[in-house]
Amino acid sequence: FTAAAIRYGSTVGPEHFPNMVLDLQALLNDTPPMTPGLEHAKAYPTVKTPPELWMLGSSSDSSSLAATAGLPYNFAYFINPKIGPEIFESYRENFQAGPNFESPHCVLTIFTVCAETEKEALELSRSRDLWFIRLLRGNPGPFPSVQEAADYAYSEGEKQIIEDNRQRRAIGTPEQVCEKLDSFVRDFNLDEVMVLTITHDSGARKHSYELLSSAWH
């Protein structure tokens, strides 16, 4: 819905995305774009070193495009936690050196909540649990408070969905979160790991990042 609102009725859909990526890559490197009519387009301001272009995705399609275009790949595990290490294995096997990167570069973005105690971290994460259930029902709305999530009457099916998703996140004390992140680095053979923390209270979110920053090696 957001993408449609931004396009304002444009007929350019996701099927054009691969060409858009390659055209942008060409414009940033001052080389001829693929799309006819763009050969006279220029990217400004001009710089000595073009900005790095990365691919963020949550499917095998984006992984394949990143490999073909020679781009570093950031997989949004917080969006699609059902895909495993094979997403990067395929990316590495099919990687073709591009104008800015000669070798593949793998990053995984994971949902995390870090607090002084595991109990507090789990309580903070309940806001996202409820938000996710509402998202599945087609009505995500504003991010709920911890109290709102605690008062919600979950069905047995919803409880199972939450439990399954929680296994794929890094939630707990700084030590527990670091241990979980280390396991992701090993299992996915990562070059980098990126974390995403969303809480109802912005102070708790900031503190989560601070705790993890201090503990992460």
Question: Which residue stretches match the model-derived regions?
Answer:
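Short aromatic-enriched loop/helix-cap "lid" or pocket-rim segments at secondary-structure transitions
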Residues: 1-5, 67, 208
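An alpha-helical appendage that flanks or caps ligand/catalytic pockets
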Residues: 4, 8-42, 83-188
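Active-site mouth loops of central-metabolism enzymes
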Residues: 47-57, 165-174
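Hydrophobic faces of well-ordered beta-strands that scaffold small-molecule active sites
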Residues: 52-56, 73-76, 104-111, 193-195
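A conserved active-site cap/scaffold subdomain adjacent to cofactor or substrate pockets
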Residues: 59-82, 87-88, 92
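Active-site-proximal loop/turn and secondary-structure-junction residues that shape catalytic pockets
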Residues: 79, 112-114, 199
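Generic C-terminus detector
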Residues: 179, 185-217
